[in-house]
Swiss-Prot record:
Protein name (record): Adhesion G protein-coupled receptor A3
PROSITE patterns: G_PROTEIN_RECEP_F2_3 (PS50227), G_PROTEIN_RECEP_F2_4 (PS50261), GAIN_B (PS50221), IG_LIKE (PS50835), LRR (PS51450)
Glycosylation sites: 81, 98, 159, 206, 301, 332, 433, 453, 592, 652, 687, 728, 821
GAIN-B domain residues: 583-750
GO MF annotations in UniProt: G protein-coupled receptor activity
LRRCT domain ranges (all copies): 187-237
TM spans (from-to): 762-782, 797-817, 827-847, 877-897, 920-940, 997-1017, 1025-1045
Membrane-side (Extracellular) residue stretches: 34-761, 818-826, 898-919, 1018-1024
Annotated region described as GPS, given as residue ranges: 701-750
Topology relative to the membrane: Multi-pass membrane protein
Family note: Belongs to the G-protein coupled receptor 2 family. Adhesion G-protein coupled receptor (ADGR) subfamily.
Disulfide-bond pairs as recorded: 264-324, 720-734
Species of the source: Homo sapiens
Length: 1321
């Protein structure tokens, strides 16, 4: 038997070979084996062995036809019969017909995801007995029943997620006997009573429901379907439809005759559902005459019910609200839309801008009959406390009526635009209880400290509502302090603007509600058994007593404030607390069982009001009218208000005491009340004395009645009259217990705020003197700018310094107490902040300038071809002195404008304490410290270098170039020209010591003035009086110092004043440039001295060169005298040596000579007595330097001068000062011009400042040229004038051409003029 078996085993390989070839051909050709047709284009056929141990005929096939946009399932004959997996996902298959997959009996997995399947016929999956996995995810399946899944007996996993059905009916999966996993998550899944069967079926069949959660109702959203408790799966109202919409869904604006179709669709959840149409609550049915057509209800895909409405001919009556109404036994639901029908000639509402407390709204041009909507402005804070869904857009609406006019509007859904109002609204929405009432009240109290800045009526209304809520808890023992906090809040509200309080009273009776809440505080507190209750605040004082009617002998109560009568802040700030936070500024009560006022005299107080209750208040007649509680014990309340702000008259009060708001409350308001009594006691007078805070006319005594003007309240004068009145006090008498006050007509009068708006007279007087002195300095330095010898930088610094001190003083005396106007007060704070910082910065700039001049070193010669450095602009000083304060103030104001102005605890205009530390006190202290360091450095430098006394001028650019070009010719010029320095070389008349003294004392006096002024306005009596006088003394000292230092002690300023006030005394200034008359025929020719030193100073000059060139010689007065008289000439080698001991006394006593008038004529030959070429120029320069300085004090006369006959009539301090200055300049010349052996060293040893006097005057030195005549007049009014026959600034060169320096007359004489003791030849 074995061999046949072996033979059979050997016969198998020939049979397997054809089968393998057929399978290979099927794979390569893409066709199905076993006679199957080819796959459609784009499909992929994948066949591979299932396993090594499986028979050859049991092959597995996978067909993938994904993303081919197939519109229907492929015919079964196009697929291999042995297909195991069929992928038809991501196509456009819309329906599955009966027998769509017949013949695929081996199919185990069918994937139909992401198609458009909406209809599945029963038996669609018939023949798929081997199918184990079916995926119908993300289709449009709405109808599911058991017949659909008939024949799927081996189906293990079914996925129906992402379809349209909202519920599954019982028995849907009865034919799926092998089902183990199920998914049916949809966007419309409704977990109600219709899926209760699912819980039982899942447990019985042991089915796993994956990733399926409830979507509706909202209460079960996101809960697993099988995890919901069965008792929650109900079909009770309200009805929540998974899908319900109406198109169009928004308001429709149409014209008459138009056609408008509507559609309404809802989730089909019950068989009795129906859709109805309504217009303005009336049911709508088909009416062909009016063009209305209603389609019957239609069921779509077993999931939606729909209905349609068509209005084919719209008329004006179609305007209204149209709705789609879904009706079921489980409840109803409605969707509506507005229809506006317009005529052909419709009108429009114009565009309009509305600004209110909810924001800025710009309404567009809108058709008549249309309601316009605008989105509210979103704010980050408080957005969660407004009504509506936070996800919804909150909008304001406004209706435009048919006439084209804006009508109703609504902004209630919008947040308040103002931060203050928004926060107060948040307070108002907070839930209150006994635990958090006190804490919330304290938070509100802290916020109402800024009540003076309230700008919206809703601010006051919200606070009034909060006070009413707090009042409910005042009766509780745990909330004892709540009453005190309520009084403080009401006191802060009195700081608000009267207009805001008036609007709040008119809108919601807010002020009256606050007062009535305060009246109930004492009632609740005394109900607990207490006999006395009192609470005080800056603007309100409350006192309550339990009084026995028996033995009552009357009572006098006084309202006072613990400040001195001379305290000027006692009347204006209306009870603001003082900076230390104590309550000395608050109102207080003091009562005494007496009916006389004299026994209640209080020291150091301001009595605001007093009230006298007579002994007959509890007479036997009244005792019967009263309703006693606890054996004839009565609760007496007294409330005092600093002013009448909480009692505004809002209605038509023409017939009342205020006479249509013509009269105003000008006194405090005092309230008297006995609990349980509200009757007029016509026969019992109550005397009230009130202090007036304003002056007016037509005074009327009045009492407040809360019931007048429909509950708005008003003042009436019935039963009240005035007993006595003087300038400040008014006594009235009323015959009822009420709120008492005095009203006056303030037309043309202002609030009596003398103590608030006026400082002490000493402050004003001394400040005016300081302002006048500063103004005099500013005007003098601006008007006489060209005559005052001061550098341009120093001039700018001094003028700006004076201006900012002037600005500080003006703003201080004029605005420091203007606390009633918030805007003005803020402006005062900003200006004071700026001017103070600017002043100390300009002092610092001045100190830095002095330091640079003191430490300045001599400049060396530079290459003539090298361009000079660019000039540094004056703007840099303004950027420091004015720019830095502007930046600091700008940042402070931009951060919070409320940093400036009056604080609630300060009766002056300045800054808040915290911002001022970093924005003012810190920078000001640092700048002051830097200034002091500069002053100390200058002082040390001057001690080390006592020779540095004056500030010298800088050579101009042209002078520097000329000096560099003339270096080779210096040996040919008189050495006197190298060392010639006069007062014209001074840049500033003041010495460095004087400038240092001026800057340091200015800073010291300014800081002292600022501090004393601040103390004078911030402290109370008597310290404010003391510092007012100290301020005055400092101000006078400051004034005297400024005028003396910057004006009186300066010769140039004094000269300018003399020229302005006494023009006749300055006649010489007119003669300065006048040429003298010809003297040839009068005086003849002056004698000549050929061997004089005047001749010897002109070296190496021929006759022709002397005639035709402008090289010229410089002759001092002494040289000119020597030229006239050879016997009196100085020896050549006997030049006196000048050392550091050169003083005014030595110069005046060493040489005393008088040189007669001199006239020099040109001569043709000048050869005799010429100096030797090898003569030392250093000795000559030294000699001429000393002679030049001597020449300053040698009195001479010039022929033809009007002053040559005036004697020296005055020798005083001014002349001594001038001589000392010239002596110093001579010393400085000698220091800068040491003896030189040859001309080759001139450039390296001579500073540029010394060469400044050898170059011609350039265009940049016009200011110095303008100053010279004035200086000549000042120095020569008391003596004759020297004569110099050479040009002071050296030869003039222009384009290589030389010309005569001065013209001559017909006789050849030189025309001489007076110019700084010199005559130009």
């Amino acid at each position: 038997m074995e061999p046949p078996g072996r033979r059979r085993g050997r016969a198998q390989p020939p049979l397997l070979l054809p089968l393998s070839l057929l399978a290979l051909l099927a794979l390569l050709g893409g066709g199905g084996g076993g006679g199957a047709a080819a796959l459609p284009a784009g499909c992929k056929h994948d066949g591979r062995p299932r396993g090594a141990g499986r028979a050859a005929g049991a092959a597995e096939g996978k067909v993938v036809c994904s993303s081919l946009e197939l519109a229907q399932v492929l015919p079964p004959d196009t697929l291999p019969n042995r297909t195991v997996t069929l992928i038809l996902s991501n196509n456009k298959i819309s329906e599955l017909k009966n027998g769509s997959f017949s013949g695929l009996s081996l199919l185990e997995r069918l994937d139909l995801r992401n198609n458009l399947i909406s209809s599945i016929d029963p038996g669609a999956f018939w023949g798929l007995s081997s199918l184990k996995r079916l995926d119908l995810t993300n289709n449009r399946i709405g109808c599911l029943n058991a017949d659909i899944f008939r024949g799927l007996t081996n189906l293990v996993r079914l996925n129906l997620s992402g379809n349209l059905f909202s519920s599954l009916s019982q028995g849907t999966f009865d034919y799926l006997a092998s089902l183990r996993s199920l998914e049916f998550q949809t966007e419309y899944l409704l977990c109600d009573c219709n899926i209760l069967w699912m819980h039982r079926w899942v447990k019985e069949k042991n089915i796993t429901v994956r990733d399926t959660r409830c979507v509706y109702p909202k209460s079960l959203q996101a809960q697993p379907v099988t995890g919901v408790k069965q008792e929650l799966l109900t079909c009770d109202p309200p009805l929540e439809l998974p899908s319900f919409y109406m198109t169009p869904s928004h308001r429709q604006v149409v014209f008459e005759g138009d056609s408008l179709p509507f559609q309404c669709m809802a989730s089909y959840i019950d068989q009795d559902m129906q859709v109805l149409w309504y217009q303005d609550g009336r049911i709508v049915e088909t009416d062909e005459s009016q063009g209305i057509f209603v389609e019957k209800n239609m069921i779509h895909n077993c999931s939606l019910i729909a209905s349609a409405l068509t209005i084919s001919n719209i008329q004006a009556g179609s305007t209204g609200n149209w709705g789609c109404h879904v009706q079921t036994k489980r409840g109803n639901n409605t969707r509506t839309v507005d229809i506006v029908v317009l005529e052909s000639s419709a009108q429009y509402c114009p565009p309009e801008r509305v600004v209110n407390n909810k924001g800025d709204f710009r309404w567009p041009r809108t058709l008549a009959g249309i309601t316009a909507y605008l989105q509210c402005t979103r704010n980050t804070h408080g957005s969660g406390i407004y009504p509506g869904n936070p996800q919804d857009e909150r909008k304001a609406w406004r209706r435009c009526d048919r006439g084209g006019f804006w009508a109703d509007d609504d902004y209630s859904r919008c947040q308040y635009a103002n931060d203050v109002t928004r926060v107060l609204y948040m307070f108002n929405q907070m839930p209150l209880n006994l635990t958090n009432a006190v804490a919330t009240a304290r938070q509100l109290l802290a916020y109402t400290v800024e009540a003076a800045n309230f700008s919206d009526k809703m601010d006051v209304i919200f606070v009034a509502e909060m006070i009413e809520k707090f009042g409910r808890f005042t009766k509780e023992e745990k909330s004892k302090e709540l009453g005190d906090v309520m009084v403080d809040i009401a006191s802060n509200i009195m700081l608000a603007d009267e207009r805001v309080l008036w609007l709040a009273q008119r809108e919601a009776k807010a002020c009256s509600r606050i007062v009535q809440c305060l009246q109930r505080i004492a009632t609740y507190r005394l109900a607990g058994g207490a006999h006395v209750y009192s609470t005080y605040s800056p603007n309100i004082a409350l006192e309550a007593y339990v009084i026995k009617s028996t033995g009552f002998t009357g009572m006098t109560c006084t309202v006072f404030q613990k400040v001195a009568a001379s305290d000027r802040t006692g009347l204006s700030d209306y009870g603001r607390r003082d900076p230390e936070g104590n309550l000395d500024k608050q109102l207080s009560f003091k009562c005494n069982v007496s009916n006389t006022f004299s026994s209640l005299a209080l020291k150091n107080t301001i009595v605001e009001a007093s009230i006298q209750l007579p002994p007959s208040l509890f007479s036997p007649k009244q005792k019967r009218e009263l309703r006693p509680t606890d054996d004839s014990l009565y609760k007496l309340q007294l409330i005092a208000f600093r002013n009448g702000k909480l009692f505004p008259a809002t209605g038509n009060s023409t017939n009342l005491a205020d006479d249509g708001k013509r009269r105003t409350v000008v006194t405090p308001v005092i309230l008297t009340k006995i609990d349980g009594v509200n009757v007029d006691t016509h026969h019992i007078p109550v005397n009230v004395t009130l202090r007036r805070i304003a002056h007016g006319a037509d005074a009327v005594a009045a009492r407040w009645d809360f019931d007048l003007l429909n509950g708005q309240g008003g003042w009436k004068s019935d039963g009240c009259h005035i007993l006595y009145s003087d300038e400040n006090i008014t006594t009235i008498q009323c015959y009822s217990l009420s709120n008492y006050a005095v009203l006056m007509d303030l037309t043309g009068s202002e609030l009596y705020t003398q103590a608030a708006s006026l400082l002490h007279p000493v402050v004003y007087t001394t400040a005016i003197i300081l302002l006048l002195c500063l103004l005099a300095v500013i005007v003098s330095y601006i008007y006489h700018h060209s005559l005052i010898r001061i550098s341009l930088k120093s001039w700018h610094m001094l003028v700006n310094l004076c201006f900012h001190i002037f600005l500080t003083c003006v703003v201080f005396v004029g605005g420091i107490t203007q606390t009633r106007n918030a805007s003005i007060c803020q402006a005062v704070g900003i200006i004071l902040h700026y001017s103070t910082l600017a002043t100390v910065l300009w002092v610092g700039v001045t100190a830095r300038n002095i330091y640079k001049q003191v430490t300045k070193k001599a400049k060396r010669c530079q290459d003539p071809d090298e361009p000079p450095p660019p000039p540094r602009p004056m703007l840099r000083f303004y950027l420091i002195g004015g720019g830095i304060p502007i930046i600091v103030c700008g940042i402070t104001a931009a951060a919070n404008i409320k940093n400036y102005g009056s604080r609630p605890n300060a009766p002056y205009c300045w800054m808040a304490w915290e911002p001022s530390l970093g924005a003012f006190y810190g920078p000001a202290s640092f700048i002051t410290f830097v200034n002091c360091m500069y002053f100390l450095s200058i002082f040390i430098q001057l001690k080390r270098h006592p020779e540095r006394k004056y500030e010298l001028k800088e050579p101009t650019e042209e002078q520097q170039r000329l000096a560099a070009n003339e270096n080779g010719e210096i040996n040919h010029q008189d050495s006197m020209s190298l060392s010639l320095i006069s007062t014209s070389a001074l840049e500033n008349e003041h010495t460095f010591h004087s400038q240092l003294l001026g800057a340091s004392l200015t800073l010291l006096l300014y800081v002292a003035l600022w501090m004393f002024g601040a103390l004078a306005v911030s402290l109370y009596y008597p310290l404010d009086l003391v510092f007012s006088f100290v301020f005055g003394a400092t101000s006078l000292s400051f004034s005297a110092f400024f005028v003396v230092h910057h004006c009186v002690n300066r010769e140039d300023v004094r000269l300018a004043w003399i020229m302005t006030c006494c023009p006749g005394r300055s006649s010489y200034s007119v003669q300065v440039n006048v040429q003298p008359p010809n003297s040839n025929g009068t005086n003849g020719e002056a004698p000549k001295c050929p061997n004089s030193s005047a001749e010897s100073s002109c070296t190496n000059k021929s006759a022709s060169s002397f005639k035709n060139s402008s090289q010229g010689c410089k002759l001092t007065n002494l040289q000119a005298a020597a030229a006239q008289c050879h016997a009196n000439s100085l020896p050549l080698n006997s030049t006196p040596q000048l050392d550091n001991s050169l003083t005014e006394h030595s110069m005046d006593n060493d040489i005393k000579m008088h040189v007669a008038p001199l006239e020099v004529q040109f001569r043709t030959n000048v050869h005799s007595s010429r100096h030797h070429k090898n003569r030392s120029k250093g000795h000559r320069a030294s000699r001429l330097t000393v002679l030049r300085e001597y020449a300053y004090d040698v009195p001479t006369s010039v022929e033809g001068s009007v002053q040559n006959g005036l004697p020296k009539s005055r020798l005083g301090n001014n002349e001594g000062h001038s001589r000392s200055r010239r002596a110093y300049l001579a010393y400085r010349e000698r220091q800068y011009n040491p003896p030189q052996q040859d001309s080759s060293d001139a450039c390296s040893t001579l500073p540029k400042s010394s060469r400044n006097f050898e170059k011609p005057v350039s265009t940049t030195s016009k200011k110095d040229a303008l100053r010279k005549p004035a200086v000549v007049e000042l120095e020569n009014q008391q003596k004759s004038y020297g004569l110099n026959l050479a040009i002071q600034n050296g030869p003039i060169k222009s384009n290589g051409q030389e010309g005569p320096l001065l013209g001559t007359d017909s006789t050849g004489n030189v025309r001489t003029g007076l110019w700084k003791h010199e005559t130009t030849v």
